[in-house]
Structures are given as C-alpha cells and as structure tokens.
C-alpha cells in the first residue's frame, strides 16, 4: 500500500502532557484522541490507554526514552502529542529535546493539587524553553458535587501561583477542569467530553502558531572546510535554520574571534543554488576567507543573530551505567567534553551549593565554563562526552558570560 502523503494544509504543533505521576496524563491523552474522533471525526482515531502506556523505546542522543507519539487534529490545527510513561522519561525527553514541545498540557489532579513532580515538570519546561503551558485539572468526578467548585478553585489558585513562580503567565493561563475518565466513557456532562473540547479550544487559541526554523535567522554549523583552486574556501554543513542567499553577508562565530565574510556561491549535490534553506546540506563559497581561518565547530550565521559564549548554566541529565554512562559519580570541577552541534569543547563543571557529587541517573543544574567560546543561545542542546562516549545530555538554561 502506498504511503499516505502528509497533509500540510493545517498548521502543525507539537504538544506533550506533563505532570505528577498518576494524575492522569496518559488517560487524558486517550480521552483527547477518543473525544476528537467522536466530535470531529476526520483523521482522528481513538487510541486506548494501554496502547499509549506501552510506549515504544526510542534513542535520542544515545539515551533510551520511552515515549508514545499520538496524532490528532482540531478544526484549525494538526497536533503531534507525546506522552511518556515514567518520570525519568519526561526528564530525559525534555532535556534531550527528543520531542521539542511547542506547548505542554500540565495535568493536575483535583484531589491532590500540585505535587513534587508537578513543580519539577514546570521548572523543567521553563529551563528547556517550552514556550506555552495550559492546564487541565483532572479527576473532577472524584469530588463531591457540592464541594467541587470550591476545591477546584483552590487547586487553580495553587497552580497559577506555581506557574507565576517559574515565570509562566499564571494569571492568564487557560485552566480547564474535567474528568479524563468520564470523557473516555463518552460522558456528555460538562466534566466529560465537553471539558476535553474546551481544552482543545484553549490549545488552539492560547498557543500561537510557532515560528518555524525557516523564519528564524540563518545558521549553519560548519562540518568541513576545503579550498577549491581559483575559487576560494568552501564551508559545508546542514542549514539548521533560516535562509541563505548568494551575496549574503555572514559571520563566522565560535572558537576564535568572530569574523565577517560574504557568501559568493551556494552548491548542493554539485548544483548551484540561488538560496539554501533549513534542512539543506550545502557548500558555501566564502569570499576572501583562507582555509585555515575557519574550522569545524564554528557556525555561519546572519550577522548579529547569535554570539559566542564560554560560561552558562545548564540543566543536565547524567546517563546511568545501563545506558552506557559512567559507573561512578562525578564531583565539582569535573572536566568532560561538551559536544555542541559539530564539535567537542572541554569545559569545567561547577556543582550547585550543597551538592557534593552527581550520580549516574541524576538530573542536575550546574554551571559550565568552556575553554573556548561557542555560538550559543538559551535552549541549545549538547551532549557531555568522556573518552568519546556520551555520559550525559544537557540544555543551556542561562548564558552567564
């Protein structure tokens, strides 16, 4: 059977459910697919809880993560939805960016209110740069009808306070309450299917269409450099974001002092291009640049769009022994290599006050100082390597210098 072509007529967004264990994240995912299949039909297919729960394992940057991907659509948009079974899987997924989320649905039980992982997931969402969070207060059916409104109001206040604490707009965040279980059963009272449709409406209206990589400023990590006699120096790599046109000025950033040059030609598969865009593997001919003035690990970028830095705060997940990581903990002043885009740079890790050591399997906030600067922005992902093997994965949470 021929593969169905992906329909691009609707804007596409990546969303994920986050929240404390047993607050109903997977049930909500099942309820969304089931409710939309009934209410809208179209391409929506109901997916049962147990189909989502036995999530296939995938490897992202060498780390095994169990994630379940579902898809559904509203009248306005197509969504890819990721749900992870275990708390550790959420941490790894968010830090490695295995599924980059354009928005997260935070699930909070009406009977418990915010719990430790609720906080941890909100903090992680903030640290790794999830731009929007909306909230579903679940298990409303577990509250006595006469107490329901009052209890939900209290939980809602707590959640808004938490969101504000971690710099999300807690006062304006849409919060919908209902029961994922009731919706799954086809219940048509306000806490059943209508609550799910209300949540979808909040997702459609509160979260704007994301800027896609093509709209962002041009950036290409340099993979290789060679010189063509009589033509000059060519830098090759895959365009990470944006568009590059012939005669555009670019900066060469990272490792050494920043320089400027002009792209006088673009080739792909030995054909000349007028312009290259995100996803293209190209060779860029650089005016007046000598082969020894540019190296793998630098980036070509639109002037002024990104700067080189050495010091940053990071959110890091350290692999367990079983995942191929270290067998022993590391301590302050640990000096591994940090792999950014196309190259390793040595850096020194400083642990937070009161943390003596970091064990395999931990996730930890630490500060890093690299020996040479790398073009970076908040949200940039990296791997931590030692002797050529990956021992951790991280994301730049804050640039300090």
UniProtKB/Swiss-Prot annotation:
Record Pfam families: GTP_EFTU (PF00009), GTP_EFTU_D2 (PF03144), GTP_EFTU_D3 (PF03143)
PANTHER family in the record: ELONGATION FACTOR TU, MITOCHONDRIAL (PTHR43721:SF22), ELONGATION FACTOR TU-RELATED (PTHR43721)
Alphabetized CDD domains for the sequence: EF_Tu, EFTU_II, EFTU_III
Name recorded for this polypeptide: Elongation factor Tu
Stated role: GTP hydrolase that promotes the GTP-dependent binding of aminoacyl-tRNA to the A-site of ribosomes during protein biosynthesis.
GO cellular component: cytosol
Record's keyword terms, sorted: Cytoplasm, Elongation factor, GTP-binding, Hydrolase, Magnesium, Metal-binding, Nucleotide-binding, Protein biosynthesis
Enzyme category, top tier: hydrolase
Region feature (G1): 19-26
G4, as annotated region: 138-141
Region (G5): 179-181
PROSITE patterns noted in UniProt: G_TR_1, G_TR_2
Subcellular location(s) per record: Cytoplasm
